[in-house]
């Protein structure tokens, strides 16, 4: 198997628990710009199928199956990053890099988890129908947000994963890689979703810059985790593909 194909397929094994050929961290980092599209599409299809099956089997509450499905597919790794970031937000700036890497769970982690879970719960309870165009852009945008900032911002001290990904992204092809990530981000998105993407990208950039002064693997996981239900909520209300389909059903 070619090195490039192996590195591309390795995105799945790195960002999810989906079985796929593994690659070195450096190879995965070098081609991480493809992960929003590749991983996003596959996980988006899984999300859609689970919600579709859940709604058909047990009614609208079947959409709640999306919450454990998303976390299981991610192997709970991104959720761990969210919890670590929650704890880090509660301490002084000097201790934040250290808290990001410790194994303890404090009140900050619980608080940020409750914020995330509340948004996700609202988003799933609003799902009266399983439409693929709700899930594809949400998965792709969440990952594009994190990968974009990983390339733009320097790693925080002590973040080996952040340094490897940043260095591999910031090569001579960085402009092309960054542009491709943005193309992937808007590929399945409505205008309102694109606006939400720009706003969240700015919010997360300012947070990472002012609070942590850089990026790390935990912050990447936190961004993917927290932004996904927000994008999903926006997609449910603004997905023009869905509304065009609904309108077409009313035509004679």
UniProtKB/Swiss-Prot annotation:
User: Its membrane topology, per UniProt?
Assistant: Multi-pass membrane protein
* Keyword Cell membrane among UniProt keywords: yes
Compartment(s): Cell membrane
**Pfam families in UniProt:** CobS
Q: Which GO terms describe its biological process?
A: cobalamin biosynthetic process
Q: Which cofactor does it need?
A: Mg(2+)
Q: Which UniProt keywords apply?
A: Cell membrane, Cobalamin biosynthesis, Magnesium, Membrane, Transferase, Transmembrane, Transmembrane helix
Q: Does the keyword Metal-binding apply?
A: no
InterPro entries to which the protein is assigned, alphabetical: CobS
Which reaction does this enzyme catalyse, per its entry? alpha-ribazole + adenosylcob(III)inamide-GDP = adenosylcob(III)alamin + GMP + H(+); alpha-ribazole 5'-phosphate + adenosylcob(III)inamide-GDP = adenosylcob(III)alamin 5'-phosphate + GMP + H(+)
**Which stretches are transmembrane?**
33-53, 105-125, 132-152, 184-204, 215-235
**Pathway of action:** Cofactor biosynthesis; adenosylcobalamin biosynthesis; adenosylcobalamin from cob(II)yrinate a,c-diamide: step 7/7
The EC code for this enzyme is: 2.7.8.26
GO molecular function (one): cobalamin 5'-phosphate synthase activity
Q: Out of the domains of life, which is the source?
A: Archaea
User: What is the role of the protein in this entry?
Assistant: Joins adenosylcobinamide-GDP and alpha-ribazole to generate adenosylcobalamin (Ado-cobalamin). Also synthesizes adenosylcobalamin 5'-phosphate from adenosylcobinamide-GDP and alpha-ribazole 5'-phosphate.
Q: Which family does it belong to?
A: Belongs to the CobS family.
Q: This protein is called what?
A: Adenosylcobinamide-GDP ribazoletransferase
């Amino acid at each position: 198997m070619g090195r490039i194909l192996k590195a591309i397929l390795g995105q799945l094994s790195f960002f999810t628990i989906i079985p796929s050929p593994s690659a070195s961290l450096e190879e995965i980092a070098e081609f991480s710009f493809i992960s929003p599209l590749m991983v996003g599409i596959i996980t988006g299809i899984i999300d859609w199928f689970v919600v579709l099956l859940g709604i058909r089997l047990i009614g609208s509450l079947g959409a709640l199956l999306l919450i454990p499905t998303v976390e299981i597919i991610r192997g709970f790794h991104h959720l761990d990053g969210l919890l670590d970031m929650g704890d880090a937000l509660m301490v002084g700036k000097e201790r934040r890099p250290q808290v990001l890497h410790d194994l303890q769970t404090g009140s900050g982690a619980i608080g940020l988890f409750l914020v995330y879970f509340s948004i996700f719960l609202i988003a799933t309870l609003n799902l009266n129908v399983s439409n693929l165009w709700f899930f594809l852009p949400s998965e792709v945008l969440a990952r594009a947000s994190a990968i974009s900032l990983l390339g733009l911002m320097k790693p925080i001290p002590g973040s080996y994963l952040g340094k490897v990904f940043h260095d591999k992204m910031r090569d001579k092809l960085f402009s092309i890689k960054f542009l491709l990530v943005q193309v992937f981000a808007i590929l399945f998105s409505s205008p309102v979703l694109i606006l939400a993407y720009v706003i969240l990208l700015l919010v997360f950039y300012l947070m990472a810059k002012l609070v942590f002064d850089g990026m790390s693997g935990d912050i990447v996981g936190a961004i993917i985790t927290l932004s996904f239900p927000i994008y999903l909520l926006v997609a449910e209300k603004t997905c023009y593909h869905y509304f065009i389909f609904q309108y077409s059903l009313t035509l004679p």
